[in-house]
């Protein structure tokens, strides 16, 4: 569908700049709204992915071209945002045009990923027929990994190959075939939902804060201080001291301040809870020292 001509294609060259960007804005809005009928499918994928990651699985994205770049973008942000190891969310992408047509290359990439039954393979393709991605999902079938498809073509081959199909009908692009536009935007929005909701359900956030943030620069260190102060009710100075004692780990710092324990005990409580800050704080309130 993204290859079809836009209804206003013949007049695009004659539009003013304001008319052109207004048209694109309207098209983007329509594409975003097209996700709404599929939210049940997105939510189902979130629940299934969270269940597998809770069991020690990994989340693998497979895409080519724009879809691959979108996959890489989402995967790259997960460690810093949620504090997960880079291996937990991995993007397997190709960029050369000829590679998109290579089904066996997709199979090879999936084999290298060593997919297992607790893992998740997410195939991303605007057309839903990219050979590289189809090959990857075919290999995922033999490993019993969960297969999720994100496409912009309802009834696609990729959707049929998946356990859960999220097929958002975005319609023709303003420039026919330019899937970096609406299709790429929608793919990123769906991946935003999947990764953010999954890691929130896995307790890598708390009350809308990045309690897993890895403070690798000044901006993130400042954010970590705000997170600790906001969730502990402590001053900036107290939060900084707790973070230092916690080795920069916001969750440990929050437990130190909220429960009045030392860093080693705070870390142990979190480890025994599987990193669930909410559970640790609730247990601390129920059983005060």
Where in the sequence are the language-model features?
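Cofactor-/ligand-binding subdomain signature composed of acidic, glycine-rich
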Residues: 1-38
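Gly-rich Lys/Arg/Thr-decorated short loops/hinges at beta-loop-alpha junctions or inter-strand turns
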Residues: 23-31, 88-95, 206, 233, ...
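A short, well-structured juxtamembrane/interface segment
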Residues: 37-54
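Charged, alpha-helix-enriched surfaces in structured cytosolic catalytic cores
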Residues: 40, 44, 131, 185, ...
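Glycine-rich phosphate-binding loops that contact phosphosugars or nucleotide phosphates
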Residues: 59-190, 196-204
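Short, amphipathic alpha-helical interaction segments embedded in low-complexity terminal/linker regions
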Residues: 198-289
